Amino acid sequence: PPNPHDGSLSLGHMFLYKKPTKQVDITYKGLPLVDRNKLQDYIDEYGATKLNKREIAELIKDGKIVGLVYGDSEVGPRALGNRSIVCDPNIADMKDILNSKVKFREWYRPFAPFCKKEEAHKWFDTRNFDNLEYMSYAPRVKVDTLPSITHEDGTARLQVVTEESHSHFYELLTEFGKLSETNVLLNTSFNIRGYPILSSIKDALYALNNTEMDYVVIEDYLFGKLK
């Protein structure tokens, strides 16, 4: 992890040939935004404003669907916080809204939750899992208040975060936890059907303006739809 698929075979072969002398964390060593130098231009065009995590959490608690863009992208097929769409999984029809009006994909496709590592046991049966940071396992959901991330068999493909592994996600959860009894958020990759996970601000804003996503947050700047 976080890149357990055929596309990472060459990297695995390299590590097998020459074992690293220390642990190498490649989670967020993917592509930078190719138009990062134009961020201020987009801020001016959209009238974007900078928010703190409390304000972002309030939008999510209010039922808004928010795209998040921070730093370089993730390595591998999992969106682990730097290229993510997040929303409140306590809302019963959120899965259907995302599939039909944002991701444009089949109705049955599931979504993943993320929560703080130290709180995961409250909502998920994590007893038999050593590492849940990479959305690689599906523990059983222990509560019935998370319909939008619970699979038909009662499991969910969980990602846990710490302040060290993803400070933005962790702070967002801290603030969301002050607003909700169930401190879990829904996370899905920031792309729409037929497109890869985004690699530019232009891609992020295209998705915003061509789906029913409500907002995009880029490095804590809030972008709304162009009027």
Task: Tell where the protein language model's regions lie, with residue ranges.
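Flexible beta->alpha loop and helix N-cap segments adjacent to enzyme active/binding sites
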Residues: 1-227
